[in-house]
């Protein structure tokens, strides 16, 4: 996982996916104040993903703000050939736990709701996923991105251990 630099972000063609829009209300003695929150995921379907949470008086403004925040939080994720991940990974954010696992070719994305939208935005095509605990969409997305950011390729593992790649693959 690497955080993208400003000049790298400009070149990307990002696809935006709206996960949720929520109307919230602040009640005072005099009246009720309504506003909107929006959760947006942006990704290039080639290993780059980001999420944003925006708040505004109008729904369109909240969606726009969320999209701009998502552009600022882009991460590069390691994807291996076949559209899957290198190894199993689990992550927890607040009450939400997410477990992602590589799958064989032709399996597709088996995941629910918010987790699925993150995996699609990254560009994964064959992944198994299980979400436990809280079903809060914001926390599930943060846990999924945390799990994806913990993924390591064979090259990084070989560098950390100071041994050759073939020794890791063969054993």
Swiss-Prot record:
What GO biological process, any one, is recorded here? translation
- Provide the GO MF annotations for this entry: rRNA binding; structural constituent of ribosome
Q: Domain S5 DRBM, which positions? A: 14-77
Q: Provide the Gene Ontology terms for cellular component.
A: small ribosomal subunit
Q: How does it assemble?
A: Part of the 30S ribosomal subunit. Contacts proteins S4 and S8.
Name the NCBIfam families for this protein: rpsE_bact
For this protein, the record's HAMAP family field holds: Ribosomal_uS5_B (MF_01307_B)
Name of the protein this chain belongs to: Small ribosomal subunit protein uS5
Q: Identify the species of origin.
A: Karelsulcia muelleri (strain GWSS)
